[in-house]
């Protein structure tokens, strides 16, 4: 009985973790000056509201420049990254 409860609890925790990571947005880990090319170290995934660029698309914006300064812990929005197009 205990193993069935633990298995069910593990399943619920995995589902919640999957849902939360799916709704993460890209957030700046540091101040990013205007016209700076983005690197992975400059960004992290975080659940925020309003949502910005999905964390799952972070690899698409690495190497692209920001068109304005981005503050530390600010959510990267699509209009902040030059030539960014959302995945379909």
From Swiss-Prot:
The keyword GTP-binding does not apply. It holds the Pfam family SAF. InterPro entries: AFP_Neu5c_C, AFP_Neu5c_C_sf, Antifreeze_III, SAF. Residues 1-23 form the signal peptide. It comes from the Eukaryota. The record marks 30, 35, 39, 65 as: Important for ice-binding. Residues 25-84 form the AFP-like domain. SUPFAM superfamilies: AFP III-like domain. Coiled coil: none annotated. Keywords: Antifreeze protein, Secreted, Signal. It is found in: Secreted. GO terms for cellular component: extracellular region. Belongs to the type-III AFP family. Contributes to protect fish blood from freezing at subzero sea water temperatures. Lowers the blood freezing point. Binds to nascent ice crystals and prevents further growth. This is Type-3 ice-structuring protein 1.9. It comes from Anarhichas lupus (Atlantic wolffish).
